[in-house]
Amino acid sequence: MDFELTASMMCANYGNLEKEVRDLEAGGIDSFHIDIMDGRYVPNFAMSLNDMAYIASATEKPLDVHLMIEHPNNNIHIFLDRLRKGDTVYIHPEAEYHPSTTLQKIINAGMIPGIAINPGTSIETVMEMLVIVKKVLVMSVNPGNAGQMYLPYVGKKITKLLAIKDEMNFEIYWDGACGADKIMQYAPRGVKGFVLGTTLLFGKEAPYGETLQNIRELRF
């Protein structure tokens, strides 16, 4: 079963970010997930613009930048100028006056446009944007903090997205409380990738390479 694993870098050891990036890359991670929070759209702060730029310079692996900020269109150029073609930028539609304008700027910069869907956001409210984006990041927890519990009703949202993803040409990614059971349940059904945090990847005794290999060898 072919699925992507991306490391949630807000869960990494900030005291030695260089080593974390190096070890994750050597361990076989597919991409790095960067959570940017402004303390307004979500009640917390996470990684900084400098953290994002450093990781972009330290690896050739793709970055998935998740903008949990109000009105990202106002400052989207600051992020795009520090990323590489082929990196992904997710925005929250609720945080923007005209999200399609912001998504078009991401496309024009040569990056992959994505939207993040909160647990309380219905698919019907973002349907028009699904023809623009290439990736949909489904939040299985409310955004803003690591280590939250999975919200079971998100499963119905993923089922709806799986039914239309091929027709509308986007891929689905899972973010939040991602355990082995969720990968085993949803990867065979067509979820393309999973953001790994403290549940499966970080804070474990085993090296990253061993942990990632064990995840890839899950039996479906």
Tell me the role of every PLM-derived stretch.
Residues F3-M9, F32-I34, L63-L67, D87-I91, ...:
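Hydrophobic faces of well-ordered beta-strands that scaffold small-molecule active sites
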Residues L17, L24, D35, F79, ...:
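Conserved, mostly hydrophobic/aromatic
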Residues E20-I34, I78-G86, V126-M139:
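Alpha/beta enzyme core
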Residues V21, H71-R82, T121-L130, C178-F194:
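Catalytic cores of alpha/beta
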Residues D38-K105:
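N-terminal active-site wall of soluble small-molecule enzyme domains
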Residues G39-A46, P119, M127-T159, D166, ...:
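Glycine/Thr-rich beta-alpha phosphate-binding loop at enzyme active sites
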Residues F45-V65, N108-G114, V154-I172, N214-F220:
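Alpha-helix-loop-beta-strand connector modules within alpha/beta enzyme cores
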Residues V89, P93-E96, L137-G147, R189-T211:
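Glycine-rich phosphate-binding active-site loops on the catalytic face of alpha/beta enzymes
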